Amino acid sequence: MTTINYNENINNNNNTLESFGIEEWLINNLKEQSIINLFPVQQEIVPFINRTEGHDICVCAPTGSGKTLAYAIPLVQKIVKRVVRRVRVAVIVPTHDLVIQVEKTFQSIIKGTDLVVLSLGVKPFHIEQKLLIKNHSYGEHALYESLVDIIVSTPGRIVDHINETLGFTLKYLNYLVIDEADRLLRQSFQDWLEIVIDSTNQHSDLNQQQEEQLIKYNSKGDIELFEKSISLKDNNNQMNHLCWSEFKLVKLLLSATMTYNPSKISLLQLNAPLFFTTSKTKEIKYSMPSTLKECYIISNGDQKPLVLLNIIYESLLKNNANGENKKKIICFTKSVDITHRLNTLLKLIGQVDKLKFTCEEYSSSLSTVERADLLSRFKLNQIDILICSDIMSRGMDIQDIDVVINYNTPPNITLYVHRVGRTARAGNFGVSYTIVDKSEIKYYISMMKKAERSQTLHCLKWKPNVYEKFQSSYKLGLNQMRLIYSKRKINDIGDNGDDNNDNNNEDGNEIDGSVENIENNNNNNNNNNKNNNNNNFEKDYEVKLKHSLLEISKKKAKINFNI
């Protein structure tokens, strides 16, 4: 097994699309999307897949480097001349949002062909079944026709169709793509992998003695094979997957942080795999775009919202001074609950030193349709800031995100890489900020050092008076937020008839809906309770509200606003 390394900064942009073996009809489709050059990872992967058979491929490259098109272009070109329609390409991704995104990429490059691509996991199951398979059965004879060539799916959904959709099969599959491979190879996803591999019926026994073929490029860029006889007798079955065999199915693994755990990779039964990476593996473990500037700010816990406001202010102020559009900002938190509460607070504040901004919550508490709508508005500059849980940390491709903020320090380097990788994509410049609590600084620095990264980390030190301009608006927003949560708490008391069921709210658990929805719900609850309690609830409500606000002022927020 040979690792093929290439430099991320290879400057081959003068090469034409034709020079990479891309056919004219496909070039026209790419040019319609203003794609006239390939990025480095695409320059390596596209021609390699076009001219190579029988090798599985693992690609470890930074987020935003163009990995999706790197495999979509050659795979479409490989199957476009098929005669009988079968499921020949299956792309597995971890989230529904990524399913939609990858499907759109395929749709954009298959124009003018009769290829059909279908996303699984987005539509109702019974509708997907009708779009996948046509039943021509008569009597006791079962005859099924595949209606698609390419499927893009989450792991669970493809397993559902394997088990429950009559006529659906992967035995004709030519290419299995596992995007965000490091996440999908985690233990919780192992069952789907075995089911999918088994369903391809591509298993074959390896002989005890085989020829391992090592591959590298010569000075002319041609592939050279170096044969080396090896014995597998003492290496157990875990090493069998690394050797050459006659194998129909080709597997492609892609991620910004690729695992090298043999026990996990062995489940894939890789065939003579080749590893593509952006730099020498011995020198760097986690590759980041060279166009990304990484910063961190050390802060006290209660100061974090003010640090966030200053980052927003600095980002908006620079663009405003230059007469440019507002920067697109993504702010990551560690939970859905904090995402909701931070979004509520920022909505109430609404501006930083007279610079207005708009923000929305993007988390798993929203439906797929709602998240898609938010992304569309974000792309159209109708939203300045998305407050996100980690649902958006992987794979979501929005080209012009300028700033990524880690409101909470990521617990591991893998998550950090995927978060900050939302900016500085496709050769654009971007900035990331990580707000590090004083108690976490040693862990954070240690984590970044162990990652053996090549980029410089910039520590920003802001004087306390920098935050003074935000103090009044922050306090006002926080007080309004406490009032809203207090009203919600009292409504819950009124609904439940006692004080024993409100402990969860004091811990800051998630409250559904925006600030406006909360207030509307309060009004509806008030009307219902008035009728049910013979118009006595309003007076009781006012008494409880005054009591609650008094307790808040005395104890400095009985409700925990740990944001």
Curated annotation (Swiss-Prot):
Cellular component, GO annotation: nucleolus; nucleus
Compositionally biased spans, kind Acidic residues: 495-510
UniProt catalytic activity: ATP + H2O = ADP + phosphate + H(+)
Domain of life: Eukaryota
GO molecular function terms attached to this record: ATP binding; ATP hydrolysis activity; RNA binding; RNA helicase activity
SUPFAM superfamilies: P-loop containing nucleoside triphosphate hydrolases
Residues at which ATP binds: 61-68
Compartments (UniProt record): Nucleus, Nucleolus
Keyword check for DNA damage: no
CDD domains in UniProt: DEADc_DDX51, SF2_C_DEAD
Ranges where the Helicase ATP-binding domain occurs: 48-276
Record keywords: ATP-binding, Helicase, Hydrolase, Nucleotide-binding, Nucleus, Ribosome biogenesis, RNA-binding, rRNA processing
Domain Helicase C-terminal: residue ranges: 308-482
Biased composition (Low complexity): 520-536
Annotated stretches, region: Disordered: 493-537
Gene3D superfamilies the record matches: P-loop containing nucleotide triphosphate hydrolases
EC id: 3.6.4.13
Enzyme category, top tier: hydrolase
Sequence motif Q motif, location on chain: 15-43
Short sequence motif named DEAD box, residue ranges: 179-182
Main subcellular localisation: nucleus
Family of this protein: Belongs to the DEAD box helicase family. DDX51/DBP6 subfamily.
Function: Probable ATP-binding RNA helicase which may be involved in ribosome biogenesis.
Domains (record comment): The Q motif is unique to and characteristic of the DEAD box family of RNA helicases and controls ATP binding and hydrolysis.
Protein name, UniProt field: Probable ATP-dependent RNA helicase ddx51
Originating organism: Dictyostelium discoideum
